């Protein structure tokens, strides 16, 4: 299939070949018939992408601050590489389309193949032959509404939500500033709801179009508009003003204040500088509001991705119910869309269309609809011409990779591409855009959105999984079933029940494939050096580990029961494994305490202290906190043994104090990513034995769940048979 994407690095817009995205259990797969180009929004996105790095920094100073804080903590080089990786990732364009359902997931049973649907949402309702859309971002198209009309859904509900923010009543007088697509939809909805409407735009053609759509007074003159509003409201002013224009100045807001009555509402639906003269605002006690997207549920992962609806008794107009309402207005001919369509263009000419838009060749454009071919094959595997795949040599290992999130693309995939004897074969992600771009970037031979190719392809000798936590236990089972070596990003699993199932399965195996969990820290040169300093110790040691993890909101996916479960489960095995590597023994007893906060500004289980007793008599304490400053050191280790002390900080500087001081330093953080992947490949080749036994891997997860239990019961937990 083909899809329109933009490089945020260069601003270039291209029509590229992609594998068809996965439908997924909580999605529907839609064959697009039409999609709508949102000229204002998409032009702004492209213009930002075309700016230089300095221009982007000036446009988004908030992101610059975040990058600087990260650089102070993790080093300039690593932060720069991650930032460039984000800029390099292509952005799908488009957020409003219509088509026919071809597949529906088990959790999207409200839709069936053959349904005509309107789809909304950035990153979902894209300009592409096929789109994978969550149910709350789709709606069946009424019989009287054409597919072409339904493609206006997203713009329609942005307008509708902006109107709702004004909290209007029948007969209210509303002035609309800006008669682009958003404004022309707004004036029609307002009239359908019984409001008196006046409007203004600097383009006379759009003013004429508004008049054709029934607006009694529309003008290009701000003074004339002010006189008309004054006249029709008997000198009081408008009850509400909607700003649907796109402007960098404060003039639209200043004009809106002059047009408003006392205690009116100004709603910024488009873009404008919202720093008006305070005295003017104060004189009329006007409310200045901003309308966000398409209504409640917008940008909420639980609503958009998980399909959790908001109860109608509490939230009457979610974005999906807004979409239903907009389509009702269209079906009853209260909103006319055909007059708004100025261009109907074949999807195959999308690239040229964007070029013409940006070059100013389509000044008369209002509604630009892309039309798609009726038939496009569903192809989920895309092969590239042979390209270099990193260092080569004898006994190469064909590697298939599952998943390519931000962490994988920033750290693990670059390391894997440089790993000796690793031949990058196929990259699989659920998103075709991510799969195609990342596969080309790192030198894979092919990309796919179908996982089965990784297990069935004979040329793939090992699988690297960089997927969400809740998928990990299943992938271990797949690896065992196919006897295929697996490198699995931590954790091994997310529940004690999954761990028990894996233990039982492993015990039944006569031959177990290599399963290496991504506990990279034990492979760090700093840890290797600390192990050398510890190798001749005589007595049990005392180890203190501190992790300044950084705050993650309670609604983040890592806290979700269905995906991440908790940060303890998702991250703690890293530090348990590191303790096991440094001490050379397994934990046998656990005591743990957490803070007792409000579980919102402070997530209780993200702020814990765990005390571990090891089988060799050593003790280790782990302080894990999400309440610290991000600019402070993230990780520190102190070890006391045989009248010696080891201190290590952030995998950049390690020191041994023993009648003097020895120091081991590296230029940047060395957390062991390259080394762990090289070790995995060498194990698959039979050149090395696994550094971590399956017993140690399972035990680190047992310890994690033991910490959870100790926190819940506030009792000491004993682990048997260490």
Annotate each language-model stretch with its function.
Residues 379-442:
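N-terminal Rossmann-like dinucleotide-binding module
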Residues 123, 146-223, 227:
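Mid-domain Rossmann-like dinucleotide-binding core that forms the NAD(H)/NADP(H) cofactor-binding site
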Residues 4, 231, 235, 240-242, ...:
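C-terminal capping/lid region of NAD(P)-dependent oxidoreductase domains
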């Amino acid at each position: 299939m083909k899809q329109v994407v933009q490089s945020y690095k260069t601003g270039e817009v291209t029509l590229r070949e992609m594998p068809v995205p996965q439908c997924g259990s909580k999605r529907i797969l839609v064959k697009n018939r039409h999609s709508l180009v949102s000229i204002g929004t998409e032009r702004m996105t492209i213009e930002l992408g075309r700016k230089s790095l300095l221009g982007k920094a000036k446009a988004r100073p908030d992101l610059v601050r975040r990058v600087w804080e990260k650089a102070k903590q993790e080093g300039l080089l690593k932060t720069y590489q991650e930032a460039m990786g984000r800029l390099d990732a292509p952005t799908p364009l488009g957020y409003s389309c219509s088509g026919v359902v071809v597949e529906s997931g088990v959790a999207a049973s409200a839709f069936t193949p053959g349904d005509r649907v309107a789809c909304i949402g950035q990153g979902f309702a894209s300009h592409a032959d096929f789109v994978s859309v969550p149910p709350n971002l789709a709606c069946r198209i009424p019989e009287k509404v054409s597919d072409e009309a339904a493609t206006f859904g997203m713009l329609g509900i942005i307008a509708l939500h902006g109107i709702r923010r004004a909290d209007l009543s029948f007969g209210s007088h509303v002035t609309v500033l800006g008669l682009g697509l958003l404004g022309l939809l707004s004036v029609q909805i307002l009239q359908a709801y019984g409001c008196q409407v006046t409007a203004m735009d600097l383009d006379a053609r759009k003013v004429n179009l508004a008049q054709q759509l029934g607006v009694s007074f529309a003008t290009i003159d701000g003074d004339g508009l002010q006189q008309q509003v004054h006249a029709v409201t008997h000198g009081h002013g408008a009850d509400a003003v909607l700003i649907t224009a796109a402007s960098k100045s404060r003039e639209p807001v200043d004009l809106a204040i002059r047009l408003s009555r006392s205690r009116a509402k100004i709603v910024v639906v488009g873009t404008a500088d919202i720093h008006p003269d305070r005295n003017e605002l104060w004189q009329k006690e006007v409310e200045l509001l901003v309308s966000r997207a398409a209504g409640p549920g917008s940008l909420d992962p639980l609503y958009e991705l998980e399909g959790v609806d908001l109860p109608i008794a509490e939230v009457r107009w979610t974005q999906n119910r807004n979409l239903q309402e907009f389509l009702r207005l269209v079906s009853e001919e209260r909103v006319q869309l055909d007059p708004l369509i100025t261009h109907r263009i074949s999807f195959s000419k999308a690239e040229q269309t964007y070029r013409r838009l940006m070059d100013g060749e389509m000044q008369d454009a209002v509604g630009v609809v892309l039309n798609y071919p009726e038939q496009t094959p569903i192809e989920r595997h895309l092969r590239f011409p042979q390209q270099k795949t990193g260092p080569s040599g004898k006994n190469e290992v064909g590697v298939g990779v599952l998943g390519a999130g931000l962490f994988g693309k920033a750290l693990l995939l670059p390391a894997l591409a440089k790993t000796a004897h690793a031949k990058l074969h196929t990259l699989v992600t659920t998103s075709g855009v991510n799969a195609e771009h990342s596969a080309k970037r790192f030198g894979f031979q092919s990309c796919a959105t179908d996982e089965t190719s990784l297990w069935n392809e004979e040329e793939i000798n090992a699988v690297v999984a960089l997927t969400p936590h809740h998928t990990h236990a299943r992938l271990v089972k797949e690896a065992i079933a196919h006897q295929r070596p697996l490198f699995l990003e931590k954790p091994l699993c997310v529940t004690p029940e999954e761990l028990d199932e894996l233990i039982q399965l492993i015990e039944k195996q006569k031959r177990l494939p290599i399963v290496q969990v991504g506990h990279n820290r034990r492979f760090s040169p700093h840890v290797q050096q600390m192990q050398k300093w510890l190798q001749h110790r005589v007595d049990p040691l005392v180890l203190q580990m501190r992790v300044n993890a950084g705050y993650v909101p309670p609604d983040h996916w890592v806290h979700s029961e269905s995906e991440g479960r908790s940060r303890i489960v998702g991250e703690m095995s890293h530090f348990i494994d590191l303790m096991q590597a440094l001490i050379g023994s397994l934990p046998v007893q656990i005591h743990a305490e957490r803070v007792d906060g409000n579980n919102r500004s402070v997530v209780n289980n993200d702020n814990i202290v765990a005390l571990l007793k090891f089988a060799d008599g050593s003790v280790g304490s782990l302080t894990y906190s999400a309440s610290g400053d991000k600019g402070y050191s993230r990780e520190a280790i102190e070890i006391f043994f045989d009248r010696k002390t080891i201190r290590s900080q952030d995998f950049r500087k390690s020191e041994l104090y023993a009648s003097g001081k020895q120091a081991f330093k590296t230029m940047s953080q060395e957390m062991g990513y390259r080394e762990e992947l090289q070790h995995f490949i060498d194990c698959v080749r039979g050149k090395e034995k696994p550094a971590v036994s399956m017993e140690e891997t399972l035990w680190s997860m047992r310890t994690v769940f033991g910490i959870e239990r100790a926190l819940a019961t506030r009792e000491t937990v004993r682990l048997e048979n260490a």
